[in-house]
Amino acid sequence: MAKAYWVVCYREIKDPNKLAAYAKLSLPAIQAGGGRVLARGTAVKAYESGQLERTVLIEFDSVEHAITVHDSRAYQEALKALGDGAVRDMRVVAGS
């Protein structure tokens, strides 16, 4: 079974306190579902459109696990804590 990844790009952080509250709740929810944070932070170097934005890469054992964790009660609580604190782009990508 192919691995799957959450790729999350933060276009804008509007409220660092809400982001901190989200981080406190989201990491345990992600880890409980078998997610592993592979990378997080601001890009070291950007090409193409040149956007040096915060990016997070999380690995799961399968697409099903990635979606289940996103839809879980615990992760949804983390998203509620984030609220309008950030503008993000999040996607689930299947590994090859």
Identify the function of each model-found stretch:
Residues M1-R54, D61-I67, D71, A94-S96:
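Short S/T/G/P-rich N-terminal loop/turn motif that feeds into the first structured element of a domain
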Residues V63-R91:
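C-terminal structural segments of small proteins and small subunits
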